[in-house]
Amino acid sequence: MSNSPVSPIQAVIFDWAGTIVDFGSFAPTSIFVEAFKTEYDFDLTLEEAREPMGLGKWDHIQAVGRIPSVNARWVERFGQPMDTQDIDKIYQTFMPLQKAKVADHAAPIPHALEVVQGLKDKNIKIGSCSGYPRQVMDILVTAASDYGYQPDCVVATDDLPQGGRPAPFMALKNVIDLGVSNVRACIKVDDAAPGIDEGHNAGMWTVGLLLSGNEAGLTLQEYLDADEATMQAGRDKARAKLEKSNPHYLIDTIADFPEVVADIERRLLEGERP
């Protein structure tokens, strides 16, 4: 019989890249750049590749093509905007590249494993979902497991016919599979706006990550070496993007999450809802 305290929080649903693993969310970003270059000899900047992060990968490619700077160069080069056939070709190039390299970016973000274990010790279930498709997720899940990260549920962006973010379906699939009885007892944690929107749309508490993810775009070494001015610049850049989604909380990295959990527990016990 466990003596662990019972938390009013039933589950936390984490994103993957930039949230729990892959500091800076570099695995998908660098592969988008490579896929555009390989298929069409088209140069994409890392900044452009990052812009719509959090969407499913086909939708992400489509969204990149609609960025004004990308669209202008594409039309100048090919005479017309990117169409569905172009997106399909880039996606088909993206998939094997991503599958080949995603395991290289499976290392947990500092303190992620301890934070997750702390949640499990309180009998809080660990859900997860991602903009990665299932065939990429299966590789990443295995690689992350080798590091010690084993969530109770994994939902990929193409698992559900209804689609992925910013709609709530992946988060709600976690709710069903984990046996959660009330969505307001769930927290959605993400480093990108579509994932925060997903949490809101599912009726959950939402937490955005400023420094470990896509928006700040720092490598782990850059983060570890950063002075306060660099850190603040990263925070400001990420906050400008994430605040538009009105997350309930914004923190630097997963290391700061236990304080948020304690505050949400207090608010739930006082009768608040997201």
Region roles according to the model:
Residues 2-10, 113-118, 133-135, 139-274:
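Asp-based, Mg2+/Mn2+-dependent phosphohydrolase catalytic module
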Residues 5-113, 117-122, 138:
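N-terminal helical cap/lid subdomain that shapes the substrate entry/recognition surface
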Residues 19, 130-132:
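Conserved phosphate-coupling serine/threonine residues in phosphotransfer and NTP-handling enzymes
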Residues 105, 129, 163:
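Glycine- and other small-residue-rich loops at beta-strand/loop junctions that grip anionic moieties
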